[in-house]
């Protein structure tokens, strides 16, 4: 009986020494854009940038609400697409997105979620908000205290003709390599 207690205590002590660090700081950034397809029809695009050192990403859910009243118009669910490794590697042979044993300590994945949305059920609501939120914002984002990640976009569906949202021309991932020129437009 005494040997059993010693064994249990030994297992608990050794188990507490072999702890693993869980990182939930995977959200690096995001964009929500849309393309007008026709009357009340928009192709919604949500692009998410994930730190490969953090936890895996799941599917996306985008609530669409009337901006003036807060009333829900629809909820768009989109399955997780395959990621694209967009890590600038500075000549390294691998990234953290490929393997956790890579000597290069960084990795950035881009996920592009797209869905055709018809907003005819919005009625007289002209200004529509699309949003996305997820736990947890990356610790390298220093513009606010650590917490959840949130982004939204405002679309005026009553403008004729309908319009596309602005979009960025350069990818937002920037790792500046020592001794190499860097241009960010």
Which residues make up each language-model segment?
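Bacterial Sec-dependent N-terminal signal peptides
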Residues: 1-28
